[in-house]
């Protein structure tokens, strides 16, 4: 009797693991990451982006090009798209590399290891702000020379601002309001554990 009960629990656990990332529509994927589409029950990142695992978001899309359209660096963070290299955790000015396969993660609190675009070897990733820390980064508004519309979380809601990708930025930078709201308002309970004073650009 006990073994049947344990087998049933194991079966239910396997079903929940198998179906936790299933998608039915393009809209639900697009909400989680702009322009992602649902292909055979799995969200697929758009052209010029690659899907990578994320401990705080399940998955993220990394841009293969920088925000100006040129080939991007092999190590980058998911946001801001095309300029994620600006927000990597650094020590003595150098990006802190990590292993995306090692558990637990070796990144400091508030950061998670995101695998690079084309990096091989034991240290195949870089420490990026996790979901909660991303949402408490300051918004870098560039009203004078910003030419791209972006959205950032101000602690209460997502607001629109102008962004110049060639100037310093923070991870609190999203292409769409829906992406900002899903990223930040969807995890608002975890956000209160972080403070803006923990933010360091480099």
From Swiss-Prot:
Domain of life where this protein originates: Eukaryota
Tissue: Expressed in larval and adult hypodermis, hermaphrodite vulva and adult excretory cell and duct.
InterPro entries registered for this protein in UniProt: Cuticle_assoc_divergent, Kunitz_BPTI, Kunitz_BPTI_sf, Lustrin_cystein
Changes seen on gene knockout: RNAi-mediated knockdown causes blisters in the cuticle and abnormal localization of collagen col-19 in cuticle dorso/ventral annulae and lateral alea.
Signal peptide: 1-20
Presence of keyword Amino-acid biosynthesis: no
Gene Ontology terms, MF aspect: serine-type endopeptidase activity; serine-type endopeptidase inhibitor activity; structural constituent of collagen and cuticulin-based cuticle
GO biological process per UniProt: cuticle development involved in collagen and cuticulin-based cuticle molting cycle; protein catabolic process; vulval development
Domain BPTI/Kunitz inhibitor stretches: 135-184
Keywords of the record: Disulfide bond, Signal
Disulfide bonds listed in the record: 135-184, 158-180
PANTHER family per the UniProt record, alphabetical: PROTEIN CBG15282-RELATED
Function: Appears to lack serine protease inhibitor activity in vitro when tested with bovine pancreatic alpha-chymotrypsin and elastase. Involved in cuticle biosynthesis.
Name under which the protein is recorded: Kunitz-type protein bli-5
Organism name: Caenorhabditis elegans
């Amino acid at each position: 009797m006990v073994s049947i009960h344990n087998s049933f629990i194991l079966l239910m656990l396997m079903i929940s693991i198998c179906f936790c990332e299933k998608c039915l529509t393009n809209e639900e994927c697009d909400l989680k990451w702009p322009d992602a589409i649902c292909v055979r029950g799995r969200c697929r990142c758009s052209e010029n982006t690659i899907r990578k695992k994320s401990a705080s978001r399940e998955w993220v899309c990394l841009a293969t090009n920088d925000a100006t359209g040129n080939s991007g660096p092999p190590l980058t963070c998911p946001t801001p798209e095309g300029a994620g290299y600006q927000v990597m955790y650094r020590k003595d000015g150098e990006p802190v590399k990590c292993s995306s396969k090692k558990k637990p993660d070796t990144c400091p609190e508030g950061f998670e290891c995101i695998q690079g675009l084309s990096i091989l070897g034991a240290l195949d990733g870089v420490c990026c702000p996790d979901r909660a820390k991303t949402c408490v980064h300051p918004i870098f508004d560039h009203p004078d020379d910003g030419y791209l519309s972006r959205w950032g979380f101000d602690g209460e809601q997502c607001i629109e601002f102008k962004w110049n990708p060639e100037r310093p930025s923070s991870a609190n930078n999203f292409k769409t309001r829906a992406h900002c709201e899903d990223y930040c308002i969807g995890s608002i309970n975890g956000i209160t554990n972080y403070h803006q004073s923990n933010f360091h650009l480099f």
